[in-house]
Curated annotation (Swiss-Prot):
It catalyses: a quinone + NADH + H(+) = a quinol + NAD(+); a quinone + NADPH + H(+) = a quinol + NADP(+). It comes from Geotalea daltonii (strain DSM 22248 / JCM 15807 / FRC-32). GO terms for molecular function: flavin adenine dinucleotide binding; FMN binding; NAD binding; NADH:ubiquinone reductase (non-electrogenic) activity; NADP binding; NADPH dehydrogenase (quinone) activity. Binds 1 FMN per monomer. GO terms for cellular component: membrane. This is NAD(P)H dehydrogenase (quinone). InterPro entries: Flavodoxin/NO_synth, Flavoprotein-like_sf, Flavoprotein_WrbA-like, FMN_Rdtase-like_dom, NQO. Belongs to the WrbA family.
């Protein structure tokens, strides 16, 4: 049973969440978990002006995902920063290249899940996750979120990401805030939850 975690991260916040997702998914016996990035669409000059070159370099060891890898997985967990309440352009471009998979029905019945980040607590994390769902449903995927069984969603003693739609993190207006232990715990829970459901679906075939 194969779980693919595919993400885009500009400054490393989603990358750290993706690592936690992988950690959680690996807790499921028999799960093969693969971590991938989507291709960058911004030029080096633009990334340099945005102060993102160093962070991009630190993630360069993660292989770039191909659309065919989606078809090889039993579950796909997508990660994206928020861009005006939607997924980032890099992820949108990647998903727009999956038309061939749609024609073949290659993703029908596979588990799909999403995690996200935003600069502020109410900066569009939930709508960003929901922006994926239309595409995943068109592909016939089975959407899985982050259930309230994860008690960290009920915390009100700190600013924290996370909702029934999926794990998320608040990055700060300057990207100065790193994912908290509660946010990472949510990501680990989601990874394990998705892998567990995918395992049950595979075994039921």
């Amino acid at each position: 049973m194969k779980v693919l975690v595919v993400y885009y991260s500009m400054y490393g916040h989603i990358h750290r969440m993706a690592e936690a997702i992988v950690e959680g998914a690996k807790e499921v016996v028999g799960a093969e978990v693969v971590l991938r990035r989507v291709p960058e669409t911004l030029s080096h000059d633009v990334l340099e002006k945005m102060g993102a070159v160093e962070a991009q370099r630190s993630m360069s060891h993660i292989p770039i995902c191909t659309v065919d890898e989606l078809a090889e997985a039993d579950a796909v967990i997508f990660g994206s920063p928020t861009r005006f309440g939607n997924m980032c352009g890099q992820m949108r471009q990647f998903l727009d290249a999956t038309g061939g998979l749609w024609v073949k029905g290659s993703l029908i019945g596979k588990v799909g899940s999403v995690f996200a980040s935003s600069n502020t607590q109410h900066g569009g994390q939930e709508s960003t996750i929901l922006s994926f769902h239309t595409t995943l449903l068109h592909h016939g995927m089975v959407i899985v979120g982050l259930p309230y069984a994860f008690q960290g969603q009920m915390r009100n003693d700190e600013i924290t990401g996370g909702s029934p739609y999926g794990a998320s993190t608040v990055a700060g207006t300057q990207g100065e805030r790193q994912p908290t232990e509660n946010e990472l715990a949510a990501a680990r829970y989601q990874g394990k939850h998705v892998a567990s459901i995918a395992y049950k679906l595979v075994m039921a075939r």
